Structures are given as C-alpha cells and as structure tokens.
C-alpha cells in the first residue's frame, strides 16, 4: 500500500509543497521570512476575525467599539494589540524578505517576484484601510490626506476621490467600505500567496551562492520545518514582548482622540512602515509629481530583474554591489526617519537628497556597480 501522503489528491499537494520539497541545503536564515510572513498572515486573519465580531463600522460607534473591545471583551486588549503590532511584524518581515530577494538575486524568478510586488501593494492597501477603522484623529486625517492624493490625477481626479469617499468628505460610507475591503483583502492575499508559491515551486528556491543547486538538494521536512519553527518562536517572542510591555510604542498618541473633522492634528503621518514612501511623496513640491514618485518608489521593484546586469546572480561575492545595497538600506532608514519629522529645515532638504539617492541608487549606481564587477572578473 502506497503512502496516503503521496497518493491523496489534496495531501499530495501539501506533501510536494512542505514535506518532500527538494530544497537547497545551504539556504540561510534569510530564507525563513517567507514562512514567517505566512505566520503573520495567519495571526492577522485570526485576530482580525475576533476583532470584527465586536467592531462596528459606524462613525458614531467605531471609536467606542474599539474601547469596548479593550475594556470589556475577554482578552480583547490582547487581541487588539496583537493585531496592531502583528501588522508591524508583517512589514518588518516583508521588508527583510524583499531585501533578501534583491541581495541574493531571487528577483530573477520574474513571475514569483511580480506576484510578490502585487502582494506588497495588497498588504499596504489592507494596512492603510485597517488604520482608518479605529476612527481616531490620525485614522480620519490619514484617510483624508492619502485618498485626497488621487485628486492629483488629471481630469477624473476629483470625481474619483468623491467616488471612493462615497460623499464629499471621509464619512460613514468611507468607513463602512474600508471595513468591507479590509475584511476581504487578506483572503485575496492568501490566494495570491498560493500563486506566489506555485510559481516559486516551478523553479525551486534560490540559495545564497546564486549557483544552481540541483546537485545538492535535501527534503524540506524535517530539516527546514525545524529551522522555520525556530523562526516562529523568535518572531512570536518578539511580537508578544512588544504587545505585553509597550503595545503603543509604534502607534500614534493622536489615535486615542476620537476623529474630529474640525480639528486637524499638527503633524499628520502614517504608521512607521509607510514613512519612507511618505517622505518621498513630501519631498516633491508638485502634487502629481509627488503621487507618481510615491507609486514608483514601490513599483520600481519590478525593474530589478531588468537591472540585474551582473554575470553573478547573488551579491554574496560582489563587494561593490554590496556597498550600494547597504547604502540603499541606510537611505531607506533615513527616509523613514524623515517621514516622521515635521516639514521644516533641515528635514526638507535631507528628505529631497534621500529621495534622489533612492532612485539614483536603484536605476544607476547598482547597475553600474554590476558592470564594473563584470569588468573586474576579466582581470
């Protein structure tokens, strides 16, 4: 009798994806972030489901329903803060996962990479809409400012914004539809994750050396299941430390004030994981130009497979490219810092320089470093 794991139509798929999957023997801890993102998604869907049981998407009661969850629901405070900080964990893992893809040349799996970019946009949209739901000051004004950016689109902009709002301002209709989309998107993300994995398993995983590893593969289970479980434990430990010791560390105090359309907060800023893009948006004086720069700051990831001019896939043995990569990382951290600062000197000029460096690094410096290293190979 053959093993059910290898014959059952459904279990067979799981077996080929997580158990008997041939995996390069030398993949490092940087390859853990895919599974960690899966865990984050699972945590977010579960905690979100329980929050949705008690939340009301009405402008009059949304804020007090969140207060009710934190005060009156059994472990409601825990579920709420796990959901809020789970989003931060999600983005930390996302950024590291994308960074790994760039550093080790995994972006050359173009289908997997492009689905990943769509996933990134979907997760960002979900996080943005989720931030609006508690209906605090920053929720309301964040929603107003970000949706208003679409009015920069020529001719149809204003109509488009009012269509998204469901009226002439961010109000009940906006909150209700944002809740609906915030609920449905994670399930769309789950479906996209399956497509992402489908394309990945067509080619097999990359590895740190960037060299074909068909001659040295080992089964995913037990070697990498154990390795992934260690990652899960570290992630959950870090997340629960944040939730239980300083749950509001990454949040904005303004969001503990109920939304008031008549009172604008002094500094409107999104959650920390959007600050780099927000800094790029603010660094351009023209509205449409800023919106385009904002979109292209993420969309530029789609160009990475085309800008890979090196004869070597991975950056592991390319010190000049490594240098450019870490300059890019430092630049993104600088942009994140600037995004949270008020619009005044010297922050304006730092933001503008960092924004130029961001695009310059990706479009010019990294490809030139690759070409230079190709020349050095001939010496």
Swiss-Prot record:
SUPFAM superfamilies: a domain/subunit of cytochrome bc1 complex (Ubiquinol-cytochrome c reductase), Transmembrane di-heme cytochromes. Heme b b562 binds at residues 83, 182. Keywords: Electron transport, Heme, Iron, Membrane, Metal-binding, Mitochondrion, Mitochondrion inner membrane, Respiratory chain, Transmembrane, Transmembrane helix, Transport, Ubiquinone. The gene is MT-CYB. It comes from Eliomys quercinus. InterPro entries: Cyt_b/b6_C, Cyt_b/b6_C_sf, Cyt_b/b6_N, Cytb/b6-like_sf, Cytochrome_b, Cytochrome_b_C_euk/bac, Cytochrome_b_N_euk/bac, Di-haem_cyt_TM. Heme b b566 binds at residues 97, 196. It is found in: Mitochondrion inner membrane. The lineage of its organism: Eukaryota, Metazoa, Chordata, Craniata, Vertebrata. Its cofactor is heme b. A ubiquinone binds at residue 201. One of its GO terms (molecular function) is metal ion binding. The chain crosses the membrane at residues 33-53, 77-98, 113-133, 178-198, 226-246, 288-308, 320-340, 347-367. PANTHER family: CYTOCHROME B (PTHR19271:SF16). Component of the ubiquinol-cytochrome c reductase complex (complex III or cytochrome b-c1 complex) that is part of the mitochondrial respiratory chain. The b-c1 complex mediates electron transfer from ubiquinol to cytochrome c. Contributes to the generation of a proton gradient across the mitochondrial membrane that is then used for ATP synthesis. Pfam families: Cytochrom_B_C, Cytochrome_B. One of its GO terms (biological process) is mitochondrial electron transport, ubiquinol to cytochrome c. Coiled coil: none annotated. Binds 2 heme b groups non-covalently. The cytochrome bc1 complex contains 11 subunits: 3 respiratory subunits (MT-CYB, CYC1 and UQCRFS1), 2 core proteins (UQCRC1 and UQCRC2) and 6 low-molecular weight proteins (UQCRH/QCR6, UQCRB/QCR7, UQCRQ/QCR8, UQCR10/QCR9, UQCR11/QCR10 and a cleavage product of UQCRFS1). This cytochrome bc1 complex then forms a dimer. The keyword Transmembrane helix applies. This is Cytochrome b. It is a multi-pass membrane protein.
């Amino acid at each position: 009798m053959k093993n059910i794991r290898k014959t059952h139509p459904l279990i067979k798929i799981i077996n080929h994806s997580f158990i008997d999957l041939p995996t390069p023997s030398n993949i490092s801890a940087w390859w853990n972030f895919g599974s960690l993102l899966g865990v984050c998604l699972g945590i977010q869907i579960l905690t979100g489901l329980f929050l949705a049981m008690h939340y009301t998407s009405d402008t009059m009661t949304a804020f007090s329903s969140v207060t009710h969850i934190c005060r009156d629901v059994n472990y409601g405070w825990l579920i709420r803060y796990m959901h809020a900080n789970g989003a931060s964990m999600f983005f930390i893992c996302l950024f590291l996962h994308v960074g790994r893809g760039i550093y080790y040349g995994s972006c050359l799996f173009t289908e997997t990479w492009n689905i990943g970019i769509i996933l990134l946009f979907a997760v960002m949209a979900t996080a943005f809409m989720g931030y609006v739901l508690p209906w605090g000051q920053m929720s309301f004004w964040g929603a107003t400012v970000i949706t208003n950016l679409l009015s920069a689109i020529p001719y149809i902009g204003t109509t488009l914004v009012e269509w998204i709002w469901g009226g002439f301002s961010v109000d009940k209709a906006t909150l209700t539809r944002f809740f609906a989309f915030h609920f449905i998107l994670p399930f769309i993300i789950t479906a996209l994750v399956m497509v992402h994995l489908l394309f990945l398993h067509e080619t097999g995983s990359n590895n740190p050396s960037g060299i074909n590893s068909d001659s040295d593969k080992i089964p995913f289970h037990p070697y990498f299941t154990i390795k992934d479980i260690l990652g899960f434990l570290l992630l959950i430990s870090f997340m629960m430390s944040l939730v239980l010791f300083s749950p509001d560390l990454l949040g904005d105090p303004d969001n503990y004030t109920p939304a008031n359309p008549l009172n604008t907060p002094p500094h409107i800023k999104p959650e920390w994981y959007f600050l780099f893009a927000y800094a790029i948006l603010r660094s351009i004086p023209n509205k449409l130009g800023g919106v385009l720069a904002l979109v292209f700051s993420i969309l530029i990831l789609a160009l990475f497979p085309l800008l890979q001019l090196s004869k070597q896939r991975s950056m592991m043995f390319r010190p000049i490219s490594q240098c450019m990569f870490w300059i890019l990382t430092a630049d993104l951290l600088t942009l994140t810092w600037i995004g949270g600062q008020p619009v005044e000197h010297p922050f304006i000029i730092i933001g503008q320089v960092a924004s130029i460096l961001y695009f310059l690094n990706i479009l010019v410096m990294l490809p030139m470093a690759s070409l230079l290293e190709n020349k050095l190979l001939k010496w």
